[in-house]
């Protein structure tokens, strides 16, 4: 257990993401408004690309191209990982783009997804109107389904999308029962099912989904993190098993959060 894991939430909020390498000693990280980054040698550039490709530790501080992240977004991702208990996180330009990169990373033609009823309407439409034409089958489930969710899981089920409270009805599912039932059924079928969870309402200070067996926590940071209705932001907290797929999904779709640097000005 490192020093930060022992901190109470209020103390952790002060210290999270304060990596000195991002700020060159400045108390607050200066805004990095850059697209192109210079390297002294080709070898240095190739080393950074290698770290990105293999997702080694140095990827978090590898500033190679603005769309792929900057010290501003790296610090935010690091802070959010500390708050959620995640392996690593990915920052995006909105809550909806965070949902998109998280779910599309694990779905393909023929995949089956279970989505909670009463979910955020644009999220529901992502499944039905965007992913549907690509051959993804979506089935909506009651937030109170409990153990009966196992009856709906088939070999093609690749992802479960949950919210608590539900955006439209404020229903709160029994997360522990759902996770246990999903894991038991997937083990029985010999398949892998990714469980995603939109935690925008509670946030990591009041509920930590990854501690309850969730694979991916999604947050519309436009709400509490930004807090002033003057910018948009999304965050995806990942387990070690899911991070690489989500990071690639973000990179390959051209989604970034580089307005973070501009927001400082």
Walk through the language-model features, giving the residues of each:
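Conserved PLP-enzyme active-site core in the AAT-like
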Residues: 2-4, 13-15, 19, 88-262
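Residue-level signal for pocket-adjacent positions within structured domains
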Residues: 9, 28, 60-63, 219-220, ...
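Generic, ordered loop/turn and secondary-structure boundary motif
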Residues: 14-15, 23, 34, 38-40, ...
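N-terminal amphipathic/basic leader segments beginning at the initiator methionine
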Residues: 2-49
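Conserved N-terminal alpha-helix of the aminotransferase class I/II PLP-enzyme fold
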Residues: 30, 36, 41-97, 123-129
